[in-house]
Amino acid sequence: QRQMCIRDRLYTSAGGWPFVENSDYYNTHIPRIGGATNSIINISTPRTDYDHQSNIRKDMPMVSHEIGQWCVYPDLKEIDKYTGFLKAKNFEIFKETLIENGLGDMADKFLYASGRLQTLCYKTEIEMALRTSGLGGFQLLDLHDFPGQGTALVGVLNAFWEDKGYVNDEEYSMFCNQTVPLARIPKLILTNNEQLKADIEFSHFGEKPLHNATIVWSIETQKGKLIKAGSFKCNLPIGSGIKVGSIEYPLDTFSAPTQLTLKVGIENSKITNKWNMWVYPAEKKTIKKKPITYELDDKAFEELNQGENVLFLSYGKVAPEKGGSIVVAFTPVFWNTSWNT
């Protein structure tokens, strides 16, 4: 009866877990990548052609709960910003540990490198949601860091809502906006005997549909040299996973390793997005096989004494209490280290 009286509101169960049949929409953690080492971006070759379609309920709108949660290295310069009763003791411990290990001068580089990885993961996760036709929306855990619960540095902004220096609003809004160009690319790492293939889509949740929009695309080198360009005419209704057109381009003219960028946008607007991909020669050069060892035995030292390079893989040799139990994956820590250990 209350719902019938208040028609300008939607009702759902507590966020993240329970499904209640009389909810207006289902807010669930199911359509998100998550922190497992067997997630799509940890076990798959780099690509952008996947979505959450198999997890979408047909009987009720779904909104994904707390997607992202990708952690970044702490910005130790933030310590001085805590001028009141609250002190960043956790950051002070991180700083002491870094200095004790002789890496005190690497703090800013660790922040930037991990921040760029975090940005890539957020781009991947948000675009996966926007490619999913019928998904009602998504909730990020947060745009800024949460300093509690074991230190959850999941934000692209710090705890003071300030820029941390590795991504700006212009780049972030390319893939998180009311209108977002999308591309389903089956391979981001290719050889020059293949074709670059991409199915172009859009997510559009603007005030009204866009009629007769001109969608422009281009392929450029890392230095900005234009390789190929084109356009599509289409209408963009309200929704996600809106199909626009397809691109195919042969790569046989690239004889050396080359980074390419596919850009897609709407003509005469700020709406744009981009994806990097890499092309390598299909013909592999013969190189001398380098020694690989799992133990520093006499044979390994013999190779080293002869001036050879030896790759030492110590997996399974490090004691658990020294870090041997830590599983390594492409993605950064999900939510926080304490939660995952």
Describe the residue ranges of each PLM region.
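Substrate-binding/catalytic cleft of secreted carbohydrate-active enzymes
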Residues: 1-3, 7-157
